[in-house]
């Protein structure tokens, strides 16, 4: 069976000297991993690998994602594939958890008010991943892939009908952003 490339994010925060990691419960009626606790994430969308998506990655952040990911056989992933995984990680984090991993042209994180104003677009982004790139373009934002730390690489077990070749990343929740679960997933 075909394995689809996917990206998953461990959102971290420190609370009273304890490290917390966000997990979300998937809906009971979903076809894949129904009613399971998971980290935000999902498969790469065609738009994540587009030239428009690459243009929404700050040039100084490109080096941080290129060269750090490898295949199961130890071969370095192509830069375009590595960038697509990082963009997918940011898109899925906004889509599923409402946390926007993006910065403005000056490198400043998005304000809580700006993130709140963009929340209604999450449903559109879930239906069409290209809408995330359109949002970044319209708001003149860049995905904040620099702080994403590669954590692990997992393959869905062969007994599952849907299989994913998943890269896991970790990142602290940006200051002043709150998690808001997407109840449709």
Language model regions located:
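N-terminal leader/linker segments that precede catalytic domains of diphosphate-processing enzymes
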Residues: 1-185
């Amino acid at each position: 069976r075909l394995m689809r490339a996917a990206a998953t994010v461990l959102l971290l925060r420190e609370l009273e000297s304890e490290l917390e990691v966000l997990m979300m419960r998937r809906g009971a009626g979903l076809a894949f991993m129904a009613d399971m606790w998971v980290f935000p994430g999902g498969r790469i969308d065609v738009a994540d690998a587009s030239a428009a998506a690459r243009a929404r990655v700050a040039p100084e952040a490109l080096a941080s994602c290129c060269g750090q990911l490898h295949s199961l056989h130890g071969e370095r992933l192509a830069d375009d594939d590595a960038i697509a995984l990082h963009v997918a990680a940011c898109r899925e984090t906004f889509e599923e958890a409402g946390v926007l991993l993006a910065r403005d042209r000056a490198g400043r994180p998005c304000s809580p008010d700006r993130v709140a104003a963009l929340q209604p677009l999450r449903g559109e982004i879930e239906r069409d991943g290209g809408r995330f790139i359109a949002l970044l373009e319209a708001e003149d934002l860049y995905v904040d892939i620099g702080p994403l730390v590669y954590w692990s690489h997992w393959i869905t077990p062969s007994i599952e009908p849907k299989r994913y070749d998943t890269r896991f990343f970790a990142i602290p929740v940006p200051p002043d952003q709150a998690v808001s679960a997407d109840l449709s997933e």
